[in-house]
Amino acid sequence: MELVFIRHGFSEWNAKNLFTGWRDVNLTERGIEEAKSAGQKLKAAGYEFDIAFTSVLTRAIKTCNIVLEESNQLWIPQVKNWRLNERHYGALQGLDKKATAEQYGDEQVHIWRRSYDISPPDLDAADPNSAHNDRRYAHLPKDVIPNAENLKITLERVLPFWEDQIAPALLSGKRVLVTAHGNSLRALAKHIIGISDAEIMDFEIPTGQPLVLKLDDKLNFVEKFYL
């Protein structure tokens, strides 16, 4: 069986080189074109889906919609869930990456960005931009909403959704598309492929490129490739 991952198209804050995380920003024109191209590639390669999973952030939802529209599959069920959100970058969200490196030093920012188990500083829950003040998360217990995450915590957040939703869909024979974010997809890939803590730091997923994971009938990893 095959599972298709797509990282959302290039966003407004990708273009501005800002830390994004759970902040909700839109796609750029480049990002829209990337999503269209992804949908066209999937259509040309004959990929059909029974269900699509995405996050509750606009850039991933729009990418999912565009991909499905371009491949004439906009009608299939879509499941939006916060567990597929990008890694939460804490107090770094909204900051310029270059300016942050100048303030704290390249080494410290590199640790915050690339360490598997070290998180950036927390975002104050009372901050107007905190997810605690966003009604899309109002149904969640306050202690579940993160104030900052590393990749290890992101994996712990994403894994229950894999086990409860994505894996059962695959095992039931459904053809699955997951349109999400660089780090939530990296976390899933780490689990599925069996990438080590050290190796995952160099594992990147480009924006808007369909990544196909081939799995056996027990969801063991076989191979991966980009369309």
UniProtKB/Swiss-Prot annotation:
Name the cystine pairs. none
- The residues that hold substrate are 7-14, 20-21, 59, 86-89, 97, 113-114, 182-183
Q: In which pathway does it act?
A: Carbohydrate degradation; glycolysis; pyruvate from D-glyceraldehyde 3-phosphate: step 3/5
Q: Does the keyword Isomerase apply?
A: yes
Domain of life, per UniProt, equals: Bacteria
Listed under subunit, the entry gives: Homodimer.
Q: Which purpose does this protein serve, as stated in its record?
A: Catalyzes the interconversion of 2-phosphoglycerate and 3-phosphoglycerate.
The protein, known as: 2,3-bisphosphoglycerate-dependent phosphoglycerate mutase
Species whose genome carries this gene: Actinobacillus pleuropneumoniae serotype 5b (strain L20)
Q: What is the lineage of its organism?
A: Bacteria, Pseudomonadati, Pseudomonadota, Gammaproteobacteria, Pasteurellales
Q: Which gene encodes it?
A: gpmA
